[in-house]
Amino acid sequence: MSVLDKLGAISRRDLFKLTSQYGITSTILAAGTLGGTVTLTSLANAVETTYKKRYKNQPKHTLKFGAAGFNQRNLLIERAGCLEFARDLEERTEGEILVEFIGDNAICGQLSCVEKTQLGVVDMYAASTQNSAGGAPYLNVLDYAYMFPSRASQYHFLYSPESQRILRDPHEKRHGLKFLFSHCELRGIQLGQSFKDKPTVTKLEELFGTKNRVTGTQLGRIAMTAMNLNPVPVAWSETLDGLKQGLIDGAETWASAVAYANMSPVVSQCVDLKFFCGTEHTSMSAKVFDSMEGHLQDAIMESSYLAQVHVQAANEAALVNTVGFSTPQLDGTIFKENDVRLASMGEDQINLAKEMCSVDSQPKLWEQWRERLNGWAGGIDTYTDIAKTAREIPEDTLAENVEPRRWWRG
């Protein structure tokens, strides 16, 4: 039973009373601990226990966590690790750090959370690196086309000490943000209702000339333009209607984003192009991190490591068991129930896409941004170094089998 199902058994009036008295975060964390049938009494007791546990010591620091549109329900679809991080950090520090989880776009959204963190409105945030690249453009470094051959290679890079040198340190120095952990998927094209009655896409040329919504990533636009996928910026509020009405043919994003963001009813095919990162990450203000005592900094890093390990395993399971990103699709998954077909591309089609847009095949397309990112990173070759690290493991490694490492220890 999901947290939403558990809370759904409680009236909105009673739930409002609980959240008003104990706070949203305590209520969410408590609901996640309950099993079986949940009554108002059992939930109230769990919330009270959770609240007392969280506040048994006077917190030295309260971290305001702007979690964009995430909540207890959709974090069981796309396993971004936000609540696991918050729960573990509070327990690990025995209440010295308290995390105030603010989701449902209540304080910031996918495009604004990064700036709200930089301005000090929130202390940390969760959003995709691609949507955050507007306020922190160094995050574009993850988005070179076909730099990562698999989800396993993405996780391997994030665990590697090389990620500290190539990604985390330059990002922190330039934007004042500490990159903590991230989920990992690869983006494809999510086709709307205009492809509902068409055969499942098997060739890249079937997508040529389609008009597709693009996120905030500049490098993603380069790849889409090179593949004749016509990237167009469309406000999120207009994207679902655009896919439904056929005003746009598709949108570039990843599988679990389709599921958690309620896109599944208007998506007909999930075309698995795997052409660049889909990374729902959590970062915090470097200024806030640096202001904390050493043992609390250590705790934040250890909780980040725990969250990263959790995300690696949980999201891989959720892709199959919850989202339906598999062949065959399991009954009861979101894709199966909404008739979203998985369009897997053969190796020949992926190679064609690489020939059209990858850095190795079309280096001139990437020169300007590559030079810019290399300069921000102190003169290193960002693409070559990340691609090399990503290929340190066999290409057929399963994402759940990547060995976790504490990246900051070298």
Residue ranges, per PLM feature:
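Short, solvent-exposed loop/beta-turn-alpha elements that line the ligand-binding surface or hinge
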Residues: 151-174, 205-206
